[in-house]
């Protein structure tokens, strides 16, 4: 696709990543959520592309040091949604029902609410997962509201979870653009251009959440969740969670700081959770 705007020309290249191709195994077994961005990041660093667009919940904890997030677009709703053709909510599912999900976070949280429920691997895009649900391979699934909205399928939502019921993934609902750190005038111009569409409020929240993730050194094997909110008087509140894979334990920490200290707040929350949960859970 080619887009012309203000005398600039962009060539948009669609790329299928390794994460899109390996669908028969959990992400934690094949390299983690970074599989959705590694191929694109390599192309960025090599200079084959000038910017990479990511769902921030799929972005690795630590970026390639030659790159940065140039902007965060206005964030969508961060909640998760329960989808079923037979039950109105998670609590209404019959005993021993099967829920399809590929997320260790969702598995832990589901088990916390419904220890009797069985979870099975559920990979693929939104349409693929919903087709599996409609084919009765599972009784229900859980997906991000933001993802459903982007493909026009919010009508499939049976129950929207509150942030406390099923806390979201770090960065959920946010789209970010990764750029090279400038080493030449062209890179500097690209970063400057992209930064002009940065949504300040969304960027502050994502920065705080990812700082928490960094303090925990969280990977796809660790059930970690969290959400942040800007409040009056230039404040930000962050709440983070570490969940045991079997759902028997949930550790949480929350606090408020100035928006200027958003990253510091995230680091502090992460360090507190690390002490609470211990290295047996955070790995």
Q: Where does each model-flagged region fall?
A:
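A conserved helix-loop-strand patch within extracytoplasmic ligand-binding domains
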Residues: 56-59, 65-117, 180
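Single conserved hydrophobic/aromatic residue that forms the stacking wall/gate
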Residues: 1-8, 12
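Alpha-to-beta junction loops
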Residues: 45-54, 58, 136-146
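Short helix-initiation/N-cap motifs at beta->coil->alpha
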Residues: 15-20, 32-40, 119-131, 261
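A C-terminal functional module that forms or caps the active site or interfaces directly
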Residues: 203-273
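Pocket-lining segment of extracytoplasmic ligand-binding domains
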Residues: 119-208
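Short, structured active-site "lid" loops
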Residues: 24-50
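Short loop->beta-strand "edge-of-pocket" segments that line small-molecule binding or catalytic clefts
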Residues: 5-6, 91-102, 195-203
């Amino acid at each position: 696709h080619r887009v012309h705007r203000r005398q600039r020309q962009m060539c948009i290249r669609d790329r299928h990543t390794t994460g899109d191709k390996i669908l028969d195994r959990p992400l934690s077994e094949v390299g983690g959520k970074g599989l959705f961005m590694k191929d694109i990041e390599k192309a960025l660093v090599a200079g084959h592309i000038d910017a990479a667009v990511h769902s921030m919940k799929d972005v690795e904890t630590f970026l390639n040091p030659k790159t940065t997030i140039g902007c965060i677009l206005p964030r969508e709703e961060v909640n998760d949604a329960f989808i079923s053709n037979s039950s109105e909510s998670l609590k209404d599912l019959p005993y021993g029902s099967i829920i399809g999900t590929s997320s260790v976070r969702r598995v832990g949280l589901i088990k916390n609410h419904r220890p009797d429920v069985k979870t099975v691997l559920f990979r693929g895009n939104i349409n693929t997962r919903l087709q599996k649900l409609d084919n009765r391979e599972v009784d229900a699934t859980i997906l991000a509201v933001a993802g459903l909205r982007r493909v026009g399928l919010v009508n499939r939502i049976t129950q929207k979870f509150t942030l406390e019921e099923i806390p979201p993934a770090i960065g959920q609902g946010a789209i970010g653009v990764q750029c090279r750190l400038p080493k030449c005038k062209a890179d500097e111009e690209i970063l400057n251009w992209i930064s002009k569409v940065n949504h300040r409020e969304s960027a502050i929240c994502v920065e705080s959440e990812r700082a928490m993730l960094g303090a925990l050194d969280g990977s796809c094997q660790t059930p970690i969740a969290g959400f942040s909110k800007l409040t009056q008087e230039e404040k930000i509140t962050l709440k983070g969670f570490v969940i045991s894979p079997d759902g028997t334990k949930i550790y949480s920490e929350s606090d408020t700081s100035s928006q200027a200290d958003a990253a510091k707040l995230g680091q502090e929350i992460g360090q507190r959770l690390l002490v609470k949960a211990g290295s047996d859970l955070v790995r």
